A protein has these predicted regions:
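Short beta-strand elements in bilobed, periplasmic/extracellular small-molecule ligand-binding domains
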Residues: 63-83
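Hydrophobic alpha-helical segments within soluble ligand-binding/sensing domains
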Residues: 16-42, 85-94, 115, 156-174
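Flexible loop/turn connectors
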Residues: 94-190
Length: 192
């Protein structure tokens, strides 16, 4: 699903369209639980709670707690470039690999770029994809299908996100033409 939101910045209303981060993360965690992973780990940046993407963290944690599954939040991804993030991902991979050597590790990564980095690190160490790992990305970006092995990913309907964003922009532009413009109504939740 998609979420439309409106925020006020210096008395200006700005709308945003985003995917349903909570539902996507819930689906990812549920898949890893269903596939009998011994421990679930979510790899992400330390996202502020006010950002819609924080719902990925919240849903992952809620789902693991609901099903009483051991889990870890690794919110240590930082960096301003691919190289910086890849270097950080090496540390994260090493930590996970050393901490859970005899466990099936279900890794939910915040996006498909992170998932591809993690997949490459697994292959660099093991030369294959061992049964002790399962990865899920988020975005359904081309990198997920073009990786050394296709990556399971939570799909975002980019075409629908774009269409909804354009509709909101047109609606705002039409409203501004009026003598007394009215800001858009409350945020709406769109399911697809």
């Amino acid at each position: 699903g998609l979420v439309g939101s409106e925020m006020c910045i210096r008395d200006r209303h700005i709308c945003g369209v985003t995917s349903d981060n909570y539902m996507g993360a819930l689906q990812a965690a549920t898949l890893l639980i269903r596939d009998k992973c011994d421990v679930l780990i979510h790899v992400n940046a330390d996202v502020p709670k006010s950002i819609p993407a924080y719902d990925r963290i919240r849903a992952f944690e809620d789902t693991c707690q609901e099903y009483h599954v051991p889990y870890e939040l690794n919110l240590n991804v930082i960096g301003d470039s691919y190289q910086d993030i890849f270097a950080q991902m090496k540390h994260i991979f090493s930590d996970i690999d050393e901490k859970y050597p005899d466990k099936k590790k279900g890794i939910f990564l915040a996006n498909d770029t992170y998932a591809n980095m993690f997949l490459n690190l697994i292959f660099q160490k093991y030369g294959c994809f061992p049964d002790s790992y399962e990865l899920v990305g988020f975005d359904n970006s081309p990198i997920a299908s073009e990786a050394i092995l296709p990556i399971t990913t939570v799909g975002q309907q980019i075409d629908l996100i774009a269409k909804t964003a354009i509709e909101l922009l047109v609606q705002q532009m039409e409203e501004r033409k009026k003598r007394r413009p009215v800001s858009l109504s409350k945020p709406c939740l769109l399911y697809t």
